[in-house]
Regions:
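Aromatic (often tryptophan-rich) hydrophobic motifs at membrane interfaces
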Residues: 152-257
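Well-ordered, non-membrane alpha-helical segments in soluble/globular domains
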Residues: 40-47, 140-145, 199-203
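Short glycine/proline-enriched coil/turn segments at helix->beta-strand junctions
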Residues: 54, 101-104, 213
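Conserved donor-binding loop and adjoining core beta-sheet/short helix segment
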Residues: 1-80, 162-190, 241-243, 248-250
Length: 319
């Protein structure tokens, strides 16, 4: 996927993206920025940060020899071609086999099919999670326009999980350089109970294992051990650490360090204990570039940690 198409996809998924001197930056929290793609290595002083970063801050990966003050942690599945169902732990293998009895995975090739079949699954996902990003898609007309824009972006694979002819869930993946991004997943309540998240992830990893052009499957940024982290780690994802430089507005830094120490530790990339296996976690729709960052309002009303917005943090302080 070309960089411009990658940026277009991130904008479509709700990110505010700005370009400064040839570098794309995404606003992952109000006035806090990281480059696109997130793993892009930037030499200090080689580019300028967005103007809005002056009010909160920015963070970017740096070369190994540079002086780093933090880490960017991502969850990825190493793709060395040897993945198979038998490589999974017994419980996750059982879930995939159970799901495959009721569900099939196949591409959704046309926008017209997606518009008609995917909207009910999205509405069910929203009612369960209250995930606010691009929640305008609850409106059928908005969802249709969003779908048209999605299908205009080249090289995105849209997979559907079907029960008979009923679409229960959707994933979006794309290949950038040698990384396959498992970018988005949502499903309805019935498909969640039938373990579609496990079957979909298995299908994506199995397909990736057959391609010598894919070195890793990127799942998400590591967010400090929440339910989504547990879902991926328990199924074999590794935490990949990348040295980074963190710059914070002095006042914002003072507030975060003193009133939100846990979030500050996550900003620095300090690893919490590896999350315990989640017995039934959903891989909710998420932007892979939405990692742990300065605190923001919690928009999820669900008490189920498997249904939390993957970027939920305590309320953002008033600056």
């Amino acid at each position: 996927m070309a960089l411009e198409d990658y940026v277009a996809f991130q904008k479509l998924m709700g990110l505010n993206v700005v370009q400064v001197k040839g570098t794309y930056w995404c606003e992952v929290r109000p006035f806090f920025y990281r480059p696109l793609p997130m793993s892009q290595v930037i030499h200090q002083g080689s580019t300028s940060m967005p103007f809005g970063a002056k009010f909160c801050g920015a963070q970017y990966a740096v070369p190994p020899e540079a002086k780093a003050n933090s880490f960017l942690n991502r969850l990825s599945f190493e793709n060395n071609g040897d993945y198979s169902l038998d490589s999974l732990q017994r419980n996750w293998k059982r879930k995939v086999r159970l799901a495959s009895k009721d569900l099939i995975i196949r591409p959704i090739l046309t926008a017209s099919e997606f518009k008609q079949a995917a909207h009910p699954a999205y509405l069910s996902f929203y009612e369960r999670t209250r995930y606010k990003v691009r929640s305008e898609r609850r409106d059928p007309a908005y969802f249709a326009n969003w779908t048209d824009a999605l299908y205009r972006i080249p090289n995105i694979l849209v997979l559907g999980g079907f029960r008979d002819r009923h679409l229960g869930g959707v994933s979006l993946t794309f290949l950038k350089d040698r990384t396959l991004f498992y970018a988005t997943f949502f499903c309805d309540d019935d498909s969640l109970k039938l373990h579609l998240p496990d079957l979909m992830l298995h299908a994506v990893r199995e397909s990736a294992a057959a391609s010598p052009d894919i070195s890793e499957v990127f799942a998400s940024m590591y967010k400090g051990g929440n339910g989504l982290d547990a879902f991926y780690v328990s199924r074999g994802a590794k935490i990949v650490r990348q040295p980074a430089h963190l710059e914070l507005n002095p006042l914002a830094g003072l507030i975060i360090r003193n009133f939100f120490p846990r979030q500050y530790a996550q900003l620095l990339g300090q690893l919490a204990d590896v999350p315990a296996p989640a017995s039934n976690a959903e891989g909710p729709e998420s932007d892979p570039t939405a990692p742990t960052a300065p605190p923001r309002p919690n928009h999820s009303s669900s008490s189920n940690p498997n249904d939390l917005d993957p970027a939920d943090l305590p309320p953002r302080p008033r600056l």
